[in-house]
Amino acid sequence: MNNFDDLFTAGGEKNETKSERSFNKEEWAAKKQQERADAFELLDTATKEAVENCETFRDYLLVQSRFGRYSVSNALLIAYQNNEATYLADFETWKEKGVFVQRGEKAITLLEPGNEFTREDGTTGFSVNVKRMFDVSQTNSQRNYSRREPDERRVLKALIASSPCDIRMTNELEGNVCARYVPEDDAIYIRQGLDGYDIFRSLSQEIVIANFAKDGVSREDCSFTAYCASYILCERSGFDTGDYNFEKAPDRFKEAEPKTIRGQLDKIRDSANEVSQDMRRAMEEQQKAKPTEDINELLIKAIEAPTKKEKRKADREGR
């Protein structure tokens, strides 16, 4: 009779080895640490490339305009890995939607906050995890996530309502200046007879400058930030951005460390998002407004309407 006892012994050894290898906490932690290190290295590379020339800088701003809720770091990572991305989700989320990632597609590496922890000095911090995402263009979905063209008048009304100060029409602005915030008057002066594009482009920039002025920041110190934020706002609102010129942008970041660069980009993102949020609230309030008004009539009404500052004052007095 053949003896098959050795099969059980071998099998037992194999199962034990498999069990031992099923999860090794130290190996897993080391792997995750390496993933984070690689992701941060990728982020620094993406940051440097974004400000390397005017084209890559514009690409970054365009991505940030599409992904307004994403951090600067993640917008930089998206711009570096797939600057045409429009809608991202991880593999499981796409699967839950009944959508499948196409074979051979490379994931887009992003960063997400992890668990809260306490540092040695007692302060609170958050760990960072690596997230693998896929754009809709990498799936079998036929859905189009491109931005819809908004109603121009509705958007302009919302922008006008978002101003933190008075808006006054004038024909006395010098040269080709379309709008100008004057701190002494706490007002934005805008040229009469402008078309929708010129109103939005110039007014959005001056609104950002006016917002900075409330915090004591001069025009000279925020003009570039306001210019870039205006580009993002134009992109989000469907206005042409072909006239924006970023040829001098790389010089502003020359010799700067990646972290410093991201700090400057944070100001651009936050400035654009502040105006976007104010516009969104204004649109919600104006859902039932008549859309047949002339653009310059909107400016006249804006002059007569209470500003955000006056509304806050009225709210305080009403309490």
Which residues does each predicted region cover?
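N-terminal accessory/interface modules of nucleic-acid-binding and processing proteins
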Residues: 1-318
